[in-house]
């Protein structure tokens, strides 16, 4: 079980990323636009630097939705590999069976 503070911090980051997503996209487009001037690129670069660090989606962590485990998470299911195995053995995941050949 992850610390509740770490789970809460990640949730807060999700909110911040969502809040600044449109502005970040606009500034990123200005940086790579071949028609923009050097001054416009410089202004876009400075604008990106002024955004909060937590506005970057790279700082988000995929966590298990049940207990918040930060590593070994299956994106398709939103749970960790450990929880996935337990739930699959108990038959709680429809369509998932243990392979045998």
Curated annotation (Swiss-Prot):
Gene3D superfamilies: 1.10.287.1480
A GO molecular-function annotation: rRNA binding
Pfam families (UniProt xref): Ribosomal_S14
UniProt keywords, alphabetically: Ribonucleoprotein, Ribosomal protein, RNA-binding, rRNA-binding
GO BP terms: translation
InterPro entries noted in UniProt: Ribosomal_uS14 (IPR001209), Ribosomal_uS14_bac/plastid (IPR023036)
Domain of life: Bacteria
One GO CC term on file: small ribosomal subunit
Signal peptide (residue range): none
Keyword Transport: no
Quaternary structure and partners: Part of the 30S ribosomal subunit. Contacts proteins S3 and S10.
Record-stated family: Belongs to the universal ribosomal protein uS14 family.
Function: Binds 16S rRNA, required for the assembly of 30S particles and may also be responsible for determining the conformation of the 16S rRNA at the A site.
Listed name of the protein: Small ribosomal subunit protein uS14
